[in-house]
Structures are given as structure tokens and as C-alpha cells.
């Protein structure tokens, strides 16, 4: 009888012990996932990659970009000495997988900027993005009235594009659906789409 009682007690202790270990593992796993996500998402600057590019324009300067982002960019490329048209390209690494790059071109004393946002497509996946009406986009872009940004948004499911490139003459936007397929579109200063391409 004593042996039976002892066996039951030991079995109960073992079950409690295993349950406790299981809960601890789950908690640790959730904590690690949360920490990982926070590390990926937290920007080193004053804004994340999507906010930063919206605050920049083609007439910006290196000093202005530093002020907006919050730290100095790293020089990653430049023109050869003696070139008629010179440029310098800087990068601001905001996280391990997102950054802003700005190419400053100087010609006859005038400086213009080309701005790009780098980020993984996974960050902007959206199951509301609909590429089933691409033919309608083709029809509109070739029409006499052209294709406006608002019309583009409506045709692809009502989803706003993610700005990823800014120049003097155009803005480029991208969208990614739930399957990871993307569609990029370029709009001129008049708000008309001049070209779109991607994997749909």
C-alpha cells in the first residue's frame, strides 16, 4: 500500500515538473520572438524607413537629411576626381534590413538628390492588394487621359502604394500581395503613371 501511494506521489511530481518545463519553454520562446521583432523594427534614427523617405525631397542636402534622420550618413560612393558632373552617394542604415540612400548630383553648381528606401518585401505584404485587374491598368495608362495615382489605388484593391524612390521628375511606389508578388509604379510630377512593372 505504501509503495502504491509513493508511486502515485512520484508520478504527480513528475507530471507537475514536466508541465512546468513546458510552460517555461513556451514563455521563453514568446519572449525571444518579441525581442527579435523589436530589434528588427526599431529604427536607429528619428523615423523608420517609410516615414523618413516621405520627409525627403529632391532639393534636399546632406546636412538636411542628417537633421531629419538624426545621424550622419555614410559615404558609400562618389564620382572620380575631375569629372564634369560630380556626385556623392550616402547611406543611412536604420535597422539591419532597412536603409535610406541618397545620391547627390552636382552640375554647374546645382545639386539634386535621388532618394531610395531599402526594405524587404515581407514588411509591406498586404492581403488586400489585388493584381487581378492589371489589364485595366494597361488600358488606362495607354488612354488619352492617362492613369492617375488615385485610379491606380482603386484598381489594385484600394491599397496605397509604399513610396520607395524620389527624384526631381518622379516618385516610385510599390505594393506586395499576400503571395509575395509585387508591382512597382512610377508617377511623374503631374501625378500620372508613366510605367509600371513587377511580378504578378
Which residues make up each language-model segment?
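Positively charged n-region of N-terminal signal peptides that target proteins for export
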Residues: 1-5
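N-terminal, intrinsically disordered, polar/charged segments of Gram-positive cell-envelope systems
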Residues: 7, 22-71, 124-131, 135-136
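Short, highly charge-biased, low-complexity peptide segments
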Residues: 7, 138-142, 177-180
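C-terminal motif of bacterial Sec signal peptides marking the signal peptidase cleavage site
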Residues: 17-20
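A cross-family detector of function-defining hotspots
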Residues: 45, 62-110, 116-119, 147-200
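Short, recurring structural edge motifs at helix starts
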Residues: 49-54, 88-90, 135-141, 172-173
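Secreted/surface-exposed cysteine- and glycine-rich disulfide frameworks
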Residues: 56-59, 140-149
Amino acid at each position: 500500500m505504501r509503495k502504491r501511494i509513493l508511486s502515485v506521489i512520484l508520478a504527480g511530481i513528475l507530471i507537475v515538473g514536466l508541465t512546468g518545463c513546458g510552460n517555461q519553454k513556451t514563455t521563453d520562446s514568446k519572449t525571444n520572438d518579441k525581442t527579435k521583432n523589436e530589434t528588427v523594427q526599431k529604427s536607429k534614427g528619428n523615423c523608420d524607413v517609410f516615414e523618413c523617405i516621405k520627409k525627403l525631397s529632391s532639393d534636399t542636402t546632406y546636412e538636411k537629411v542628417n537633421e531629419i534622420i538624426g545621424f550622419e550618413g555614410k559615404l558609400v560612393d562618389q564620382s572620380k576626381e575631375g569629372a564634369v558632373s560630380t556626385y556623392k552617394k550616402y547611406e543611412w542604415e536604420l535597422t539591419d534590413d532597412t536603409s535610406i540612400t541618397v545620391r547627390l548630383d552636382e552640375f554647374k553648381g546645382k545639386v539634386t538628390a535621388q532618394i531610395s528606401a531599402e526594405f524587404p518585401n515581407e514588411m509591406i505584404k498586404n492581403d488586400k492588394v489585388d493584381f487581378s485587374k492589371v489589364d485595366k491598368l494597361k488600358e488606362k495608362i495607354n488612354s488619352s487621359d492617362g492613369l492617375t495615382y488615385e485610379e491606380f489605388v482603386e484598381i489594385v484593391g484600394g491599397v496605397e502604394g509604399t513610396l520607395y524612390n524620389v527624384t526631381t521628375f518622379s516618385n516610385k511606389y510599390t505594393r506586395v500581395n499576400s503571395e509575395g508578388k509585387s508591382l512597382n509604379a512610377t508617377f511623374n510630377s503631374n501625378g500620372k503613371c508613366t510605367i509600371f512593372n513587377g511580378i504578378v
